[in-house]
Amino acid sequence: SVVKSEDFTLPAYVDRRDYPLPDVAHVKHLSASQKALKEKEKASWSSLSMDEKVELYRIKFKESFAEMNRRSNEWKTVVGTAMFFFGITALIVMWEKRYVYGPLPQTFDKEWVAMQTKRMLDMKVNPIQGLASKWDYEKNEWKK
């Protein structure tokens, strides 16, 4: 029981749009009916029926160009998998916000930010191009 591996030094069959005529036929070992059809192929092609021509094509090629160009539904799997992982990530983030992170510091409150901004304006921080340059100290409001 010796397993014989395929010899990869020989040309292999492949269906590709950019390589339309592979070096070898799709069917390597012909049956008796296929051998008879190959003999009939050597005669005039007008004597062959449409089914025989299709069978000869299928011996040489696995897929036609129309079958190779047919759209696959693989995009649905990709989008579904991406959405699944986005959902898992959203659940993890929600769990972390609820159970891992503490409350926000007081410096994030709107009142605190307003007091800090007022303090910076009173100190005239960065009066040339910064915050203080945009405040009108005479009218006590932001410049327009």
From Swiss-Prot:
The modification Phosphoserine is found at residues 31, 33. Belongs to the cytochrome c oxidase IV family. One of its GO terms (biological process) is mitochondrial electron transport, cytochrome c to oxygen. The modification N6-succinyllysine is found at residues 4, 35. Disulfide bonds: none annotated. Keywords: Acetylation, Membrane, Mitochondrion, Mitochondrion inner membrane, Phosphoprotein, Transmembrane, Transmembrane helix. Residues 1-73 are mitochondrial matrix. SUPFAM superfamilies: Mitochondrial cytochrome c oxidase subunit IV. The keyword Phosphoprotein applies. The modification N6-acetyllysine is found at residues 4, 28, 35, 42. It is found in: Mitochondrion inner membrane. Its main location: mitochondrion. The keyword Membrane applies. Component of the cytochrome c oxidase (complex IV, CIV), a multisubunit enzyme composed of 14 subunits. The complex is composed of a catalytic core of 3 subunits MT-CO1, MT-CO2 and MT-CO3, encoded in the mitochondrial DNA, and 11 supernumerary subunits COX4I, COX5A, COX5B, COX6A, COX6B, COX6C, COX7A, COX7B, COX7C, COX8 and NDUFA4, which are encoded in the nuclear genome. It is a single-pass membrane protein. Pathway: Energy metabolism; oxidative phosphorylation. This is Cytochrome c oxidase subunit 4 isoform 1, mitochondrial. Component of the cytochrome c oxidase, the last enzyme in the mitochondrial electron transport chain which drives oxidative phosphorylation. The respiratory chain contains 3 multisubunit complexes succinate dehydrogenase (complex II, CII), ubiquinol-cytochrome c oxidoreductase (cytochrome b-c1 complex, complex III, CIII) and cytochrome c oxidase (complex IV, CIV), that cooperate to transfer electrons derived from NADH and succinate to molecular oxygen, creating an electrochemical gradient over the inner membrane that drives transmembrane transport and the ATP synthase. It holds the Pfam family COX4. Residues 100-144 are mitochondrial intermembrane. One of its GO terms (cellular component) is mitochondrial inner membrane. It comes from Theropithecus gelada (Gelada baboon). The chain crosses the membrane at residues 74-99.
